Amino acid sequence: MERQDLAHSPAAAMAARRALELAGASLADIGAFDLYSCFPIAVFNICDELGLAPDDPRRLTLTGGLPFFGGAGNNYSMHAIAEIAARVRADPGSFGLVGANGGIMSKYSVGVYSATPCIE
């Protein structure tokens, strides 16, 4: 694997921006986040790429993060998706974002969730 800077993952930012675009939302529209947190660098990486402050009042996790909840691999993210789904159902029109890292910050998936269907 070759990257110009191992501390950054432009593909993660591209995935997040594209998911937001497809959902018709912006980062400011997101009411709840859960960012995959195997290690602090994974969280700081996506925060840096998106311009999201680590102390954002919306918090960066709903579950407490991988070290405290879940298991290895993206199984943790299934718990995050379930929690985001509960949150957006309780607040129709709101958006939630789940970011999931795989590999060595070389694969990143993003889901933007809402209880309200997208209007195309």
Locate each region found by the language model.
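Conserved beta-strand-centric core segments of catalytic alpha/beta enzyme folds
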Residues: 41-42, 69-120
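Beta-strand segments within the central parallel beta-sheet cores of soluble alpha/beta enzyme folds
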Residues: 27-35, 56-64, 92-101
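Flexible glycine/proline-rich, aromatic-decorated loop/lid segments
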Residues: 44-66
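Short secondary-structure boundary/capping segments
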Residues: 3-7, 48-51, 111-114
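Accessory "access/gating" subregions that flank catalytic or transport cores
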Residues: 34-48
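Active-site pocket-shaping loop/turn-to-helix segments
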Residues: 1-18, 69-79, 83
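Phosphate/pyrophosphate-binding loops at sites that engage ATP/ADP/AMP, CoA/4′-phosphopantetheine
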Residues: 15-29, 53
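Active-site catalytic microenvironments for nucleophilic, acid-base chemistry
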Residues: 22, 49, 87
